[in-house]
Amino acid sequence: MQPRTLLTVALLALLASARAEEVEGSLLLGSVQGYMEQASKTVQDALSSVQESDIAVVARGWMDNHFRFLKGYWSKFTDKFTGFWDSNPEDQPTPAIES
C-alpha cells in the first residue's frame, strides 16, 4: 500500500469512529435531556401543588380576618342604630314642668 492510501484509510477510520461517537453522544445527550425534562416537569408539578396549598392557606386566613373585621364593624353599626331607635322620645318619661 502506498503511504497516501494508508493515510487516507486511517483518516477515514478516525472520521468514522468520531462520527459513531458523535451519534452515541447525541443519543446519550437526548436521553439525558428527556430525563431532565421529565424531572423538571415532576418538580414543577410538586411545586405548583405546594404553592396552591400555600395560597389556599393564605387566602383562608385573609378571608377569616376580613370576615371577622366585617362582623365586628357590623355589630358596632347595628348597636349604634339599635341604641338610636331605643332612645325614642315616646319611651322616655317627660320631665315635670315646674311653674
Curated annotation (Swiss-Prot):
One of its GO terms (cellular component) is cytosol. GO terms for molecular function: lipid binding. It comes from the Eukaryota. Glycans are attached at T94. Keywords: Chylomicron, Glycoprotein, Lipid degradation, Lipid metabolism, Lipid transport, Oxidation, Secreted, Sialic acid, Signal, Transport, VLDL. It comes from Mus musculus. It is found in: Secreted. The most abundant glycoforms are characterized by an O-linked disaccharide galactose linked to N-acetylgalactosamine (Gal-GalNAc), further modified with up to 3 sialic acid residues. Less abundant glycoforms are characterized by more complex and fucosylated glycan moieties. O-glycosylated on Thr-94 with a core 1 or possibly core 8 glycan. The modification Methionine sulfoxide is found at M63. The lineage of its organism: Eukaryota, Metazoa, Chordata, Craniata, Vertebrata. This is Apolipoprotein C-III. The keyword Zinc does not apply. Pfam families: Apo-CIII. Gene3D superfamilies: Apolipoprotein CIII. InterPro entries: Apo-CIII (IPR008403), Apo_CIII_sf (IPR038195). Residues 68-99 are annotated as: Lipid-binding. The gene is Apoc3. One of its GO terms (biological process) is triglyceride mobilization. The record marks K41 as: May interact with the LDL receptor.
